[in-house]
Amino acid sequence: MVVLNPNNWHWVDKNTLPWSKDYLNGKLTSLSTVSSDGKSKIELTQVSSITGDSNVSQRKGKPICYFDLQLSMNVKVTNLDTNKDDEDDDGILADGKLEIPEFMHDESDIPILSQGFDAFDGLVRSEFVPKVVETLLKYQDDLIKEHSKDIQV
């Protein structure tokens, strides 16, 4: 959808939440890493919820974006060490959630809450959460790149 601004109005907005959901689902569900000791694999299996607001606007001829999103993701830790017995039949060592209560356009410090990882919480936080943050920090640039061309002066 192209948003026209024939009289150069002060603000032009475009709702980008549907695109954001597709983008974040695509980028995040492909994330996985093998632990530094090589004994386990951590992977994001599902983005279970994305809510909030995401918009690209034009003000005085310049594209800007603003978003305030809440995300919930399912993550599992699986065993790669064939000598270990703490797993269930599928090799799953832990199955938990990562929650992001506020992912905002003006914050680079993203709070991430974890639950359900028990003994593997430290591993998930130290070796997987940085990959999630790295992916999320690319979102704003990609959002503007994708949608600023749709807002015309």
Curated annotation (Swiss-Prot):
Top-level taxon of the source organism: Eukaryota
SMART domains referenced in this protein's UniProt entry, alphabetically: Aha1_N
Location within or outside the cell: Cytoplasm; Nucleus
InterPro entries (alphabetical): Aha1 (IPR036338), AHSA1-like_N (IPR015310)
Family from the record: Belongs to the AHA1 family.
Assembly: Monomer. Interacts with HSP82.
Protein name, UniProt field: Hsp90 co-chaperone HCH1
Species annotation: Saccharomyces cerevisiae (strain ATCC 204508 / S288c)
